[in-house]
Regions:
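Extracellular (secreted or membrane-anchored) zinc-dependent metallopeptidases
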Residues: 1-180
């Protein structure tokens, strides 16, 4: 979705496996508290990987929902502050409605739904709970559909492009020239 819609390619770092914890009693995360996990993830990724060795970090849990710092890639103290949690973290709803949504905040995207749930007046351009990635499809009435479609609204693409071109996240992206 990010590559197709926003021309952003993400690559896993070679030492990603060092950030996978199999023992809940020894891992550094508070599974059911996304707010606390934001700081825990920043500290953990920086300590294990090193701040200079990655541009964006995101942690997954089996807790509920998600939370992320806005415009955080490339920012040394915020770039790993993204959390996505769901009791059953599998399938398209998890990948699109939660992971792509929370990473959308990290890249600079605000909510697009026009209802009473987490509304952002400047980007509330979709009816009801919205239907694109940065909306709340199926989460908060009036629901237009049960899950998000797998694309960004143009208003979010503009926000993301502005952030990675001119904003906080512009400092670490590499432009690749294409023959297109």
């Amino acid at each position: 979705v990010y590559e197709r819609d926003a021309a952003i390619t993400m690559e896993l770092i070679p030492s990603t496996d060092e950030l996978i914890f199999f023992n809940a009693s020894t891992d550094p995360y508070t599974n059911n508290n996304g707010g606390i996990m934001l700081g825990e993830n920043q500290e953990t990724v920086d300590n294990i990987i090193g701040s200079a060795n990655y541009d964006i970090g995101h942690v997954f849990s089996t807790g509920g929902g998600g939370i992320a710092n806005l415009n955080s890639p490339c920012s040394p103290s915020e770039k790993a502050r993204g959390v996505t949690g769901l009791p059953t973290p599998i399938g398209d709803p998890f990948d699109i409605d939660y992971v792509a949504h929370e990473m959308g905040h990290q890249y600079g995207g605000n909510h697009t739904q026009n209802n009473n749930c987490q509304i952002n007046p400047g980007t509330a351009v979709e009816p009801g709970s919205a239907s694109t990635i940065m909306g709340y499809a199926g989460i908060c009435s009036p629901n237009i559909q049960p899950n998000s479609d797998d694309y960004f609204h143009i208003i979010n693409l503009r926000e993301i492009a502005d952030n990675v071109t001119y904003g906080t996240s512009s400092t670490c992206f590499e432009e690749v020239v294409s023959d297109n």
